[in-house]
Amino acid sequence: MHPLLLDVTERIRQRSKATRAAYLAQTEQAVAQGPVREQLSCTNLAHDYAASSDTEKLILKQNHRAANIAIISAYNDVLSAHAPYRDYPQQLKKALAACGHVGQMAGGVPAMCDGVTQGQTGMELSLFSRDVIALSTAVAMSHQVFDGMLLLGICDKIVPGLLMAALRFGHLPAVFVPAGPMPSGISNNDKAKVRQAYAAGEVGRDELLHSEMASYHSAGTCTFYGTANSNQMLMEIMGLQLPGSSFINPNDPLRAPLTAAAAQRVSELTALAPDFMPLGQMVDERTLVNAMVGLLATGGSTNHSIHLPAIGRMAGILIDWQDMADLSDVVPLLTRVYPNGKADINAFQQSGGMAYLMRELASAGLLHTDVKTIMGNGLEPYFKEPYLNSEGTLSWRPAVAESLDLSVLAPAHAPFMREGGMKLLQGNLGRAIMKVSAVPDDRWQVEAPARVFTTQEAVLNAYRNGELNCDVVVVLKYQGPKANGMPELHQLTPALTNLQEAGYRVALVTDGRLSGASGKVPAAIHVCPEAYAGGWLDRVQDGDVIRLDGHHGELTVLAEGFAQRPAHEPPVLSATGVGRELFAGLRKLVTPADQGALSVGWD
C-alpha cells in the first residue's frame, strides 16, 4: 500500500472517530432487532401484502425463509440513461421469485436531466434534487417491511441521493443496478466543435440541434465521462454494484443476466441469509478513499468533490477537500475519455474497462483491497469482467492482461499524468476545486485582470459584444448553494473555449459548479465561502488581478488593500418560478460546498 494512502485513510478515521462510532452504534442496534416485519402488527402486514399475488403473499408470510426486497427506481421518460429502467422492476421481481423471494416497487424518486436544464432556470433545483431524492428514498423505506434494497439510478444527483438515504438504512444490504451507456454517436469532440461554432455565430440553431441529436440519440447514459458515468465508476470501485456491470450497453446480451444477478445477490446478503452484509458496515473510510482514488485516476466529475463529503457524512465519515488534494499528488491519471480526451466511455469499456483499471490501481498500492463489497470480503472479484460462457450463463473472467487501447486506458507504470485529475486551490479567496485532467499543462496557470459578473447571461452578452477579447479572469459570483442552489455553468464553456483558442489567457472563478463534461478552460469552481454568504469572492472588483495556479494550488487576488475591503450585504436574488420558491428553506439550511452542500441533516 502506498504510505500516503494509508496516512489519508488514518487521518479520516481519526477525524471521524466520534461520528462513525455513533453511526455504527445506531446501525448495530437496528441489526440486533432483526427483520422488522416480525415486529409489525398483522394489520400493518396485511396492508403491505394486499396488492400482492397469491404466490407473493405465501412467500411473504414465510418471514424466516423469504426476503422482501425494496426496489427504488428513478425511472422517467426524460432521462435517456434511465429509460431502460421502465421494465426493470418486473425483471427484478421475476429474478427474485426464481430464488424464492419477493420484490416490491417501494417507491419512485425524482430524477432531473442536467442536459435538459443546462443554462435554464430549472438548473437551480439540480443540486437540491440530490437531497430530495435522499428524502424520497427514506419515505419509501419507512414502511419497514424490507430486508434489502435494489437501487435503480445512474445520473448526476440520483446515485448520490440514493446512496445517502441507503446509508441511513445501513442495517440493510443494498445493491445498485446500472443500465449502461448508449451506443456511440458522433464523437464528443465533433459535438463540442459545433457548440463552439454556434457560440461564435458561425452556424445556426438547426445545425446545432442536428449535431446534438446525433450525439444524444438513444436510450442509455450519455457517452462522455461526466457525472453520470463517474457515478457508475464510483459504485463499482466502492463495491456496490456487480463487477464489470457499469458500462455494458442497454441492449447488450449481458445486460439482462447482470440485472437478474443483482437481484439474486441482494437476496443472498440479507439477515435471512448466511452472507449477511449490511451496507453501513460495508461502506467505511477505506471504501471512500477508494472512491476518491477512482475519481482522481479517471479525471472524473468535479461534482463528486461535493457528493463524496455528503455521502461520507451519512455514514459518520468526515471527508475534507484536503484529503482529495493529498491523494491527487500520488494517484496517476490512467484514462483519456472526453472531456479528458477524444474517446468516449464505450471506448474505455472496449479498452479493458473497470476490471483493468482497478487491477492496475491495486497493483500500484493505490486501492484498499481488504474492503467489504457486495461480492464479499476483498476487492479481487472486481479485477474480473463479465461474459456469457458457452452455455449462455453469466460468468466472470480475469481482466485483459494489457490495455487494448493505450490512447484511452493506460497502465499504472505509464500514466497519462503522474498526478490526479483534480486540484485544491487555496488563497485569499478561500478554497476552490480545479479540474486539470482536460486542461493543457501550459494553461494551468493564469494571471489576468478580473471581470466580475452576477449572471451567466451577463457573461455571454459581454462575450458577444467583444468585451472579453483579452486576457481575463471571468468572476461569476452569487452561484453558490445559498444564493441560487449552485447551478452548473456549462453553457459558458463554448464561449470561454473560443477565447482561449483565440490565444487569450482565460480562466473562470466562481462559487457555482461546472458540468462533468466541462474542463477545457482552467476554472476555480465551488469557491468557499460563497459570495452570498459573505465570502471574499464578493469583494473582487473589475480590474483586480487574480492568479489561478493549478501547479501550486493557488487562488489569490493580487490587488493592494484587498484584505481591508469591507463586506457588504448581498442583493436580494429572484427565487420564484419553476418551483424555486419551494426550495427557500433548503437554501437557508444548506452547508458550504466543501461540507457536501447538504440541506438535510440532524446536527
Predicted regions and their residues:
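Contiguous domain-boundary segments centered on the initiation and propagation of an alpha-helix
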Residues: R130-T137, Q144-G148, L460-L468, V475
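N-terminal small/polar loop signature for handling phosphorylated ligands or for N-terminal nucleophile
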Residues: A106-Q144
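Catalytic or ion-coupling anion/metal-binding cores of large enzyme and transporter domains
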Residues: M1-D77, A81, Q90-V109, Q120-G122, ...
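A short, small-residue-rich loop immediately preceding and capping a beta-strand
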Residues: M141-L162, V175-V177
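N-terminal glycine-rich "phosphate-gripper" loop used for MgATP/nucleotide binding
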Residues: R130, L152-C155, G352
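Acidic/charged coordination and interface sites in well-structured regions
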Residues: D87
